Amino acid sequence: MFTDMVSKLTSLQQELLSALLDSGVTKDVLVQALEDLCPCPAEFGIKIEKPLSPSSANGGSDCGDSKPVFLTLTGAQGKGGKLSGDEGSEDGDDFDTPPILRELQSLNTEEAAEQRAEVDRMLSEDPWRVARTIKGYMQQHNIPQREVVDVTGLNQSHLSQHLNKGTPMKTAKRAALYTWYVQKQREIDRQFDRVQGSDPSDSASQDQVLFFFPEFNHGGHSSGAAGGSGAAVGDEGEPGSKRMRRNRFKWGPASQEILYQAYERQKNPSKEEREALVEECNRAECVQRGVSPSKAHGLGSNLVTEVRVYNWFANRRKEEAFRQKLAMDTYTPHMNPLLSHTASLSHHHSSESKLRYSQQAASEVTSSTTISHPSVLQQVSPGGLDHCHGLLSTDAKMISVSGGVLPPVSTLTNIHSLSQSSHHHHHHHHQQAQSLIMSLAAQSLTSPQSQSVPVINSVSGLTTLQPMQFPQSSSLTQLTTAHISQQPFAQSHMYSPKQEAGQFSHPSRYSTMDSSTITHLGSSKQCPLQAW
């Protein structure tokens, strides 16, 4: 008896029996346990009205053969019972009898009896093998897992793990999954058979085709004797009573291969080319499903149309443009540091040549101011003047006076206004203004004739330039300063052509000049400040 029973078991059931025998259970004990289980427990309360499974029709003596698993599930779940296979579930949540099982049990038609027998047969087989069969069927017909979840009420994560990895699932849940699978097979077969010979281009024919698809049948009743998974169950708010959502169109692998090959040839096909691709894709989808290409109108929601082909090509072009833009954005940041480094080197080189005089003047000149008597003394060598710096602009208008060239009045006014600016900008702009004056003085001092040298004169906060006559002398290399007699609001700074005391030839203003008051400035780079 045990040998005959093993021959009817699946590989998984044989492994379970082997594990029981390896645990120390003898054959006699196992057979006795099976005989004790033959009288069905009272809590199941199953009453078999007519034999539905082939084994029960043969009048087998085994308890498992005399009671169909499908009826056991519906009766056990209705009374809170639990089967031995339920412990294998990983989610552990309570799962009542799915509405799809109760609907199938309530039907007394011949087709419903065949479906129950088919579900019983699948429950007795290896769950992992059945799961792979269902997964292959869903891929063949482009059926999303969401549709299974909506009909059966299963958890989508648990369903995905069961189909992809063989994760254990409760028997009641597997029965709901198998019931959906059996009904879906018959439904798809009817879809291809009933619309055979109709013209897919006819809109009325297309409406008739869509009526057979549950996702387009908003009445909630499916065709055939199965009763439909979308039929209302009652006022209990079961998942089967809610309205089915329409499945989104999903490109099959056969159609995608055709479209990608066409995209390599032509990225923007014409309308005629798109219509040819429609026929080719529908033919490939029919071959994938194992039906004749003449039944392409039975694809329903998976039917390829010219609009869908147009949208597919448009989306591919957008994706390609986006990838190109992304590649450029990724490449550009690597080039920016190189460009900025090159620009900084060029800017540094030009700045070094333009500001060479300003940098030298800043290192040689020390400026100082006083609140009551602002005074600045600077010592600049005429040889250090560079005519290429930016301060000597050729656009500036100069005022010609006897013996030299003076800057315009606006420049002198700017010197006074710059002295009132902030301390941060004061030093920089003051150097620019005085550098301009120094350059003019150098041009005057390098003349071989007797020149009129401009002298900075600050009177009551107003800065002016006065021409002063100097006799002809040798090369001028030093800068001297002198102050005149004690005047309360005036002090003059002039540039001497020699290191020794200068001889002034201006009788009107400097007749009382005492040569002893002229101080000698050495060759050091420091600039003395005299204030009184």
Swiss-Prot record:
InterPro entries with a match to the protein in the record: HD, HNF-1, HNF-1_N, HNF-1_POU, HNF1_dimer_N_dom_sf, HNF1b_C, HNF_P1, Homeodomain-like_sf
Alphabetic keyword roster: Activator, Developmental protein, DNA-binding, Homeobox, Nucleus, Transcription, Transcription regulation
Superkingdom of the organism of origin: Eukaryota
Transmembrane segments: none
Aminoacyl-tRNA synthetase as UniProt keyword: no
Signal peptide interval: none
Gly residues bias spans: 222-231
HNF-p1 domain span: 5-36
Start-end of DNA-binding region: 244-324
GO molecular function: DNA-binding transcription factor activity, RNA polymerase II-specific; RNA polymerase II cis-regulatory region sequence-specific DNA binding
Region named Disordered: 74-95, 222-245, 500-532
Major place of residence: nucleus
Organ and tissue specificity: First expressed at stage 10 in the intermediate mesoderm. Expressed in rhombomere r5 by 14 hpf with expression diminishing by 18 hpf.
GO biological-process terms attached to the record: anterior/posterior pattern specification involved in pronephros development; insulin secretion; liver development; pancreas development; positive regulation of DNA-templated transcription; regulation of transcription by RNA polymerase II
Residue intervals of the POU-specific atypical domain: 102-197
GO cellular component, one term: nucleus
Segments of this protein annotated with the region Dimerization: 1-35
Locations listed in the record: Nucleus
Regions of compositional bias (Polar residues) in chain numbering: 505-532
Summary of subunit composition and partner proteins: Binds DNA as a dimer. Can form homodimer or heterodimer with HNF1-alpha.
PANTHER family in the cross-refs: HEPATOCYTE NUCLEAR FACTOR 1, HEPATOCYTE NUCLEAR FACTOR 1-BETA
Similarity-based family: Belongs to the HNF1 homeobox family.
Protein name: Hepatocyte nuclear factor 1-beta-B
Phylogenetic placement of the source organism: Eukaryota, Metazoa, Chordata, Craniata, Vertebrata
Gene name of the encoded protein: hnf1bb
